[in-house]
């Protein structure tokens, strides 16, 4: 049995000893059945939140309104959630009310897909009322109950369906795909932040190409930031070898290279990306657009290591030769890597000239920077002083 389950077993045992039902549920059970890596577990119980808190010495109300209490056991923290049913979904994401219940099957009934609606008890016996194991055997993503109802409850489940297809290399069953296509406009009610998380998970999957093909088939791109009417660009994007990807930034660089938005900055901001990512991708864009392989000294210097590494990564994804080692060597051989590396400063110029500060200081430093980069002069203080025409003291 997986160590993650064994470590969390005392939580289940404490709950069952107190007379309640308790199970491992959701993604951890699914991944166990698929022999995938399990990082953490979700625990569901018939004990109500106040009852859970009485059983464990240390607990925190992390999601008490939805029945979730975080408990500490053997210096580890576990989320324990009470079985529940949910009322109507008024915003296509959150239920209007949550009711705590004692029935496992009723709790599993509200979950998204049958493969995620399997529970495992403390003896590692499975409870599978919706035939999730069969779906896993058939490599099928099938909604619990009516797919249209599940998607209406939380529109993000449509994006999750496509993401699971990519991660697991599964297929959607016919009813689930039909509901996905007919209700795709509901995705507009989902926050961009949640969509971005699912997009990245999808792109990191082993079947990203098939996932994008399905995404286009159901017209999901219409509701993704900046991708409306970009079917041909996304088809090109999907054709690249994304299994060679090593960074998240390459996904975004690839997307802007394929789409070629008028305003790269605005396009990336629409996905609510961190400023650091936006700046890096924006800087790399023009170089990547030309699939740059050979770099001039000045280009290498102004681009910097992060940019040329990212451009090279996308080149590899697009089928070009990996030039990282060669370009890195050329970069390391540069006499300076930024203006800060110059052997002189503005203070030196003021001292040597006896003049007041002004625009000329920056202009002179720019001139020295170019001279050093072109190997016209060595980056040594005395040589630079002579080169600028200042006499020795």
Curated annotation (Swiss-Prot):
Pfam families: PolyA_pol, PolyA_pol_RNAbd, tRNA_NucTran2_2. CTP binds at residues 27, 30, 111, 154, 157, 160, 163. Its cofactor is Mg(2+). It catalyses: a tRNA precursor + 2 CTP + ATP = a tRNA with a 3' CCA end + 3 diphosphate; a tRNA with a 3' CCA end + 2 CTP + ATP = a tRNA with a 3' CCACCA end + 3 diphosphate. GO terms for biological process: RNA repair; tRNA 3'-terminal CCA addition. ATP binds at residues 27, 30, 111, 154, 157, 160, 163. HAMAP family: CCA_bact_type3. Homodimer. This is CCA-adding enzyme.
């Amino acid at each position: 049995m997986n160590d993650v389950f064994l470590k969390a077993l005392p939580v289940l045992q404490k709950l069952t000893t107190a007379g309640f039902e308790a199970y491992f549920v959701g993604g951890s059970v699914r991944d166990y059945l698929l022999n995938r890596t399990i990082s953490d577990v979700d625990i569901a119980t018939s004990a109500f939140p106040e009852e859970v808190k009485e059983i464990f010495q240390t607990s925190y109300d992390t999601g008490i309104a939805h029945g979730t209490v975080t408990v500490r056991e053997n210096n580890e923290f576990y989320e324990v959630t009470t079985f529940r049913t949910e009322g109507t979904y008024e915003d296509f994401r959150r239920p209007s009310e949550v009711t705590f219940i004692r029935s496992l099957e009723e709790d599993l009934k509200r979950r998204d897909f049958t493969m995620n609606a399997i529970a495992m008890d403390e003896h590692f016996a499975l409870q599978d009322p919706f035939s999730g194991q069969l779906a896993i055997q058939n490599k099928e993503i099938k909604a619990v109950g009516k797919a249209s109802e599940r998607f209406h409850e939380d529109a993000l489940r449509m994006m999750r369906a496509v993401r699971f297809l990519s991660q697991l290399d599964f297929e959607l069953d016919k009813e689930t795909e039909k509901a996905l296509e007919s209700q795709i406009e509901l995705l507009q009610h989902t926050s961009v932040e949640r969509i971005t998380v699912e997009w990245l998970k999808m792109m990191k999957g082993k079947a990203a190409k098939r996932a994008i093909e399905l995404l286009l088939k159901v017209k999901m791109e219409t509701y993704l930031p900046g991708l409306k009417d970009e079917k041909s660009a996304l088809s090109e994007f999907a054709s690249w070898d994304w299994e060679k990807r090593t960074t998240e930034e390459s996904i975004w660089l690839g997307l802007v290279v394929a789409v070629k938005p008028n305003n790269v900055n605005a396009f990336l901001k629409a996905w609510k990306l961190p400023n650091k990512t936006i700046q890096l991708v924006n800087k790399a864009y023009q170089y990547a657009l030309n699939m740059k392989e050979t770099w001039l000294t000045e280009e290498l210097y102004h681009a910097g290591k992060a940019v040329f590494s990212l451009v090279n990564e996308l080149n590899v994804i697009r089928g070009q030769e990996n030039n990282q080692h060669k370009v890195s060597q050329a970069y390391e051989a540069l006499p300076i890597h930024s203006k800060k590396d110059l052997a002189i400063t503005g203070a030196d110029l003021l001292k040597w000239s006896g003049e007041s500060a002004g625009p000329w200081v920056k202009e002179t430093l720019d001139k020295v920077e170019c001279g050093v980069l072109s190997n016209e002069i060595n980056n040594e203080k005395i040589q630079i002083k002579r080169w600028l025409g200042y006499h020795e003291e």
